[in-house]
C-alpha cells in the first residue's frame, strides 16, 4: 500500500510543476503589466526584477501554507487515504481549470480556485463518508472548517472592494498632483511622493510580511513591531533626501524607480501568497504521508 501512496506523491509533484507553469502564466500579467506597459525599463530588466521578487518572496510563504493543510477542512476527521484522494482531486481540477481559463484568455484568481477546490473536494469526500456510514448529511459541517473558510472567502471579497477604492483614490490624487504643470510639481513634491511610495512598499512588504517569513526570529519580529514608527519615519526622511538629490542634481526620473519597486513588491507578494496555491497541496500531501509513515512504524514497534 505504501508504494501506491508513493506513486500518488510522485504524480502530485508532477502536477505541481504543471500547475505552477499554468498558474504563473495566469498571474504574471498582474505584476508585469505596469512596468511593461509604460516601458520604463527593458523587458529583460523587468523580468530580472520580477524574478528576484519571486525568489525572495518564496521565503515569506510559510504563513500561507496552513490554508492547504488545515485551513479549509479538519484533516483529523478523514483517514489518510481519504486525505490523499482529496488532495489528488484538487490538483487535477486546478490544472484543468487554470489551463481552460488561460486558453480562453479569461483571468481568474488562483486563490479563489484553490480555496473552493479544497472546499468542494472535502465536502464531497465528507458526504460520501457520511452516506456510506448511514449518517445524516447534516453532520457535514463537522468536517469543514467553516469559520476559517468563511473568513478566507470574506477576505477575498473585501480585498476586491478595498483594491477598487484605494486604486481609484490614489490614481485621482496622483493625477491631481502631476497632470497639470508636471515639471514644476515633479521638482517640488516628486521626492516626497516617491519616498511615501517606497516607504509604503517596504512597510507592507517586509514589516507586515515578516511574520510569515521562514527565517525570521521571534525577537526580530518583536523589535520591528516595537519600533515601527521610528523605522518608517527614518525611511521616509531618508528616501525624501535621496530622491530630491536624484531629481535636482542627476535629473533621474524617480517614477521609474517606484514602478520597478512596485513590480518587485507585486512579484514578492505573489510568491508569498499565490505560490502556495500551486505547491501547498502537494506539500500538505507529503506532510500527511510522513505522519502516516511514522504512525505505521510505531504500530509495528508495538506489535
Regions found by a protein language model. Give the residues of each.
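Membrane-interface helix termini and inter-helical loops of multi-pass transporters
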Residues: 69-76, 134-149, 210-223
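Transmembrane alpha-helical segments of multi-pass membrane transport proteins and ion-pumping complexes
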Residues: 17-24, 28, 54-67, 90, ...
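Conserved small/polar residues in nucleotide/adenosyl-binding loops
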Residues: 301-303
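Membrane-interface alpha-helices at helix entry/exit sites of multi-pass transporters
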Residues: 40-51, 295-297
